[in-house]
Amino acid sequence: MQDFFEYLNKSIDINDEAKAFISSVIKMREFKKGDILITQGQSKALDNYFVFSGFLRSYIIDNDGKEHTVQFAIKDWWISDYIAYYGKGEAMLSVECLSDCIVLQSDKISIEKVFEKFPHIETFHRKNLEKSFVRLNKRIVNQLQLNARDRYFNFINDFPKMESVAKNYHVASYLGITEQSLSRIRSQE
C-alpha cells in the first residue's frame, strides 16, 4: 500500500488519516497470470484496479467468438470496465492478468467514501480520468488516421515491455490488424 501512497504523494499531500481510511476500504490483491478479474456479461458490482506490478488487458469477445483487446494496463495505471463501473450495467469487457499482478482493488461505493472524506483525492482522481480520456481519444484517432505500421510503433513506444508478455493476437487485435500483418510489420523493422 505504501507504493500507492507514494504514487499519490507525487501529486497531492496524503496525511496519516487519509492513509488509514484508504487502507480500511481499499484492498491490496495478488493475482496470477491468466486470472480473470472481470468477466464479460458479469452483472454483479464491478471493481476498479490500480496496477502496482504486472500487466493486464481488457477485451471484448464479439458475436463470432473473436477477442478484441481494448486496453492494456501497466504499473500506475487503472483498469476496469468503465461502462459498467460508472453505468451500473452488465460488464461489456473482461479484464485478464497477462502476468502475475499486484493491484489495488476498489469498488465504487468505497472510492466514493474516500472522495467524500477527502475531496482533494477526488480532484486528483478526476485529473487522472482526464488523462485516461485523452489517451483513449488519442488511441481512437490513431486507429482511424494512422497506418498499421505507425500504430505498431506507437504501441511499442507506449508499452515497451508489453510485447514480451502479451500474445501476438492480443497485440494484433489492439492494433486492429491480423497476426499475419503484425508479423510482416515486425519483420520490416
Q: What role is predicted for each listed range?
A:
Residues M1-M28, A84:
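Cyclic nucleotide-binding regulatory module and flanking cytosolic helices
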Residues K32, F52-S53, I74, S99:
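A cytosolic small-molecule/anion-sensing beta-strand core signal
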Residues L37-Q42:
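Short phosphate-coordinating micro-motif centered on Lys-Gly-acidic
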Residues L46-R57, K75-D76:
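Glycine- and acidic-residue-biased ligand/ion/polar-headgroup-sensing regions
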Residues N63-I79:
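Short acidic-glycine-tyrosine-enriched beta hairpin
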Residues Y86-Q105:
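Ligand-binding loop in jelly-roll beta-barrel domains
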Residues A91, S110-N147, R151:
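A small-molecule sensor/coupling module
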Residues L146-E189:
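Phosphate-/nucleic-acid-contacting segments
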